[in-house]
C-alpha cells in the first residue's frame, strides 16, 4: 500500500499526488515511470514520476483525469492509498551534457519534462522551457520550470504569455540558433509537430511516448511503436525515442483502440460515483488531451 501524503489541483483536470514509495524514490532517474493499480482487479496504467523526495521516501505523480482509472485516482484524498505501484520502469533520459536544451511541454506533458529540465539544469546545461496550455488556468509547473531556466508560456487564447502554439515559440528559438537538443512531451499532434519543425534544422529531438501499456516489462506487447520502420516497445526500449523516427500516425491510431470501452467504463464509474454516499462533495474533472 502506498498512502497519499499530499494532493494539489494543478489545473481543471490535472492533479498532483505525493505518495509514499521509498524504494522507488531512492533509485528513480529522470524519464522513468511507474505502473499504478488503484486496487485489486483494477486497471494498470503508466505514470511518469514527476519528482521525488528521497529523504521523505515519496514520489510525485501528476495525473490528468481522462478515463475511469485516472478519474478514480484523482478523486482520492490525503490518507487514502494506492494498492500497487511498480517501478521505476523504462530507460532514464539521455541527458545533453553541455549546451542549450529546449524542453517543450504541452498540457500534462509539462510535468513530464520538468524532471528532465531539472536534471539538465543541475548538470550546468542552459535550459529554456516552453509551456503550452489552452488558457492560463491550464498552465502547470511554471514555478518549477522557472527554477531550471528561462520559460516561455504559450496559450491558445492568449490569456497568458504568448498567444499561439508552442511550435511558434520553438521555431523562433531554432531560427535564432544555438539550440542543441529539444525534449518534447505532450499530445501526439504536438510532439509530431515539434519533431517535424526541428527536422530541417537537424536538431536532435527526443519525445516521450505514452503508449497503451499493461505490464511495463515488455511481455504484453501492448505498447509497441514503430521507430524508423521497426517495432519497439515503449516500456523497455523507451519511453523516450528520437522524434524524427517515430511513426506518430500509427501511434495515434493505436491510442484510439479501446476508446469505446474506455468511455463506457468512465460512464459506469461516474454513475456509481455520483450515487455513492458523500459523492456530492467529490471533485469534478473535465476531459482533455494529454
What is each stretch, according to the model?
Residues 68-214:
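FNR/FR-type flavoprotein reductase catalytic core
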Residues 112, 188-190, 210-240:
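Local cysteine-cluster metal-coordination motifs and their immediate loop/turn environment
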Residues 42-51, 89-99, 235:
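Short, Lys/Arg- and Gly-enriched loop/turn segments at beta-strand edges
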Residues 39, 87-88, 228:
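Short, surface-exposed secondary-structure boundary micro-motifs
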Residues 195-196, 200-201, 222-260, 274-276, ...:
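Iron-sulfur (Fe-S) cluster-binding segments and ferredoxin-like electron-carrier domains
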Residues 1-78:
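Ferredoxin-reductase
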Residues 36, 84-85, 225:
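A generic structural signal for residues embedded in beta-strands
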Amino acid at each position: 500500500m502506498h498512502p497519499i501524503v499530499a494532493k494539489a489541483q494543478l489545473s481543471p483536470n490535472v492533479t498532483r499526488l505525493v505518495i509514499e514509495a521509498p524504494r522507488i524514490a531512492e533509485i528513480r532517474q529522470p524519464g522513468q515511470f511507474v505502473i499504478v493499480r488503484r486496487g485489486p482487479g483494477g486497471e494498470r496504467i503508466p505514470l511518469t514520476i514527476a519528482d521525488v523526495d528521497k529523504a521523505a521516501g515519496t514520489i510525485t505523480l501528476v495525473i490528468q483525469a481522462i478515463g475511469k482509472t485516472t478519474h478514480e485516482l484523482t478523486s482520492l484524498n490525503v490518507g487514502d492509498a494506492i494498492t500497487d505501484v511498480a517501478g521505476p520502469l523504462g530507460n532514464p533520459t539521455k541527458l545533453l551534457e553541455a549546451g542549450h536544451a529546449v524542453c517543450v511541454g504541452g498540457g500534462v506533458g509539462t510535468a513530464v519534462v520538468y524532471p528532465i529540465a531539472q536534471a539538465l539544469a543541475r548538470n550546468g546545461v542552459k535550459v529554456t522551457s516552453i509551456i503550452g496550455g489552452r488558457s492560463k488556468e491550464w498552465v502547470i509547473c511554471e514555478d518549477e520550470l522557472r527554477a531550471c531556466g528561462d520559460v516561455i508560456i504559450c496559450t491558445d487564447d492568449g490569456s497568458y504569455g504568448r498567444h499561439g502554439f508552442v511550435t511558434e515559440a520553438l521555431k523562433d528559438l531554432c531560427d535564432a540558433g544555438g539550440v542543441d537538443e529539444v525534449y518534447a512531451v505532450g499530445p501526439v499532434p504536438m510532439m509530431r509537430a515539434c519533431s517535424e519543425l526541428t527536422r530541417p534544422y537537424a536538431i536532435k529531438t527526443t519525445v516521450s511516448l505514452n503508449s497503451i501499456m499493461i505490464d511495463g516489462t515488455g511481455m504484453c506487447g501492448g505498447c509497441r511503436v514503430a521507430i524508423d520502420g521497426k517495432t519497439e516497445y515503449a516500456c523497455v526500449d523507451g519511453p523516450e525515442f528520437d522524434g524524427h523516427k517515430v511513426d506518430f500516425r500509427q501511434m495515434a491510431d493505436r491510442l484510439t483502440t479501446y476508446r469505446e470501452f474506455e468511455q463506457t467504463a468512465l460512464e459506469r464509474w461516474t454513475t456509481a460515483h455520483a450515487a455513492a454516499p458523500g459523492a456530492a462533495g467529490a471533485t469534478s474533472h473535465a476531459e482533455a488531451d494529454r
